[in-house]
A protein has these predicted regions:
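Terminal and linker regions of secretory-pathway proteins
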Residues: 1-387
Length: 387
């Protein structure tokens, strides 16, 4: 998906109002805290001009590093400044590989003035769908089905399916601090009997405007200004840039149909690409080499589940140990109110944001703003619990 969605609906200096569809100043713009560059990548995404050609995550990372080298050469005032990489959703796959590539080619990047300090992943796909979606799906369903108007009868049938598959109480059994070993995958688990998908169908039956991005959303559910509908993971051409074509030359964009999320994959479909999950490959090393890594997750996201992220972290080994040794239990405070829980160990911080969607900065801009301050070192960890 295009980073322009982030600019205009989440953390940019102006933000579209989803009711009036007018752009309004964003008091929680990340540009208040640091210099920001939003990048449409890989090639084939948004307004990017390059042709899709990547066949591995390493090639995605190499392409991005090449962009950075050109950018720093073109704008020499960037050279020597501290750099962080941030992104949400599928960027959870890209960012660890990009950071890993930069660290592995440190001499070239240091010479060019590129100094990476850390990464920030928001509701990211850094693990496989079994851990991120399927294993915690029954627990999520039990926590939210009443608020989503799903019937007791439907839930009973879903619970029976979860029992048969072996995930009915998976989180309760296996999410431990410290972990007791690698996570087991139930033998009965298969895509044709997906509890995750079955609950999604029940939610859509109960609420035509059900959004996997924000499970408590209600009607109406029109397209937003970026051509996105909360009920769908697809993007549509009815958006700001296509309906206001005079904007394109102002931002030096080509005169082409803009989609906030590409309908065609921006890289060649290869099985290898979809099995390169950072948690099993590069993420542990990136955490160890970075000054700070933050993983955020909105508790009301059903694209990826909050306890899927927790399970993934507890199944990952970095800096000499598997998972967190202590359970996340520190309160994140924003303006004197509880905004979530957080925990830090061995240069990794996990933050679970209350009542937040897949796009935390869109629905909960204040916590997102404070967490950026923490990433940048403008506040310390002990300040997260201060109003």
């Amino acid at each position: 998906c295009s980073s322009l969605t982030g600019v205009l609906t989440e953390e940019g200096p102006v933000k579209f109002n989803n009711v009036t569809h007018k752009a309004e100043p964003n008091p929680y713009s990340w540009t208040n805290l640091t210099n920001m560059i939003w990048v449409d990548q890989p090639a084939g995404t948004g307004f990017s001009r390059g042709q899709p050609k990547n066949q591995s995550m390493e090639q995605v990372a190499e392409e991005f590093n090449g962009f950075l080298l050109s950018l720093y050469q073109t704008f020499p005032k960037l050279q020597g400044k501290r750099l962080w990489l941030a992104g949400e959703s599928y960027a959870g796959k890209f960012i660890p590989y990009m950071a890993d590539w930069i660290y592995k080619h440190e001499a070239e990047n240091q010479k060019a003035g590129i100094h990476l300090h850390g990464i920030n992943m928001i509701d990211g796909f850094f693990m496989d769908d079994i851990i991120g979606k399927e294993l915690p799906s029954m627990q999520f369903a039990q926590q939210h089905y009443r608020s989503m108007n799903i019937s007791e009868a439907d839930m009973s049938a879903l619970e029976a399916k979860a029992q048969e598959i072996g995930i009915a109480d998976y989180v309760e059994k296996y999410l431990h601090y410290p972990p007791k070993g690698p996570l087991p995958v139930p033998r009965g688990l298969n895509k044709s009997e997906s509890v995750y998908s079955a609950f999604k169908k029940l939610a859509k039956k109960a609420n035509p405007c059900f959004s996997p991005f924000y499970v408590i959303g209600r009607a109406p559910c029109p397209l937003n200004s970026m051509g996105q509908n909360v009920t769908s993971e697809k993007a549509f051409p009815h958006n700001y840039f296509n309906e206001m074509p005079s904007i394109k030359p102002i931002i030096h964009a080509d005169n082409k149909t803009y989609l906030s999320c590409s309908r065609a994959k921006p890289f060649k479909i290869m099985k290898k690409l979809h099995t390169q999950f950072p948690i099993h490959t590069v993420l542990p090393g990136v955490i160890e080499k970075s000054n700070r890594t933050i993983i955020q997750h909105g508790k009301l996201d059903y694209i990826m589940l909050v306890n899927g992220t927790s399970l993934a972290i507890q199944n990952m080994t970095w800096a000499g140990a598997q998972g967190f040794q202590s359970k996340p239990n520190k309160t994140l405070l924003v303006d004197g109110e509880t905004a979530g829980l957080y925990h830090s160990e061995r240069k990794l911080s996990l933050v679970q944001v209350d009542r937040a969607s897949h796009m935390i900065a869109a629905y909960k801009p204040k916590p997102a703003y404070k967490l950026l301050q923490f990433l940048l070192g403008q506040i310390e960890e002990e300040d997260l619990i201060k109003a």
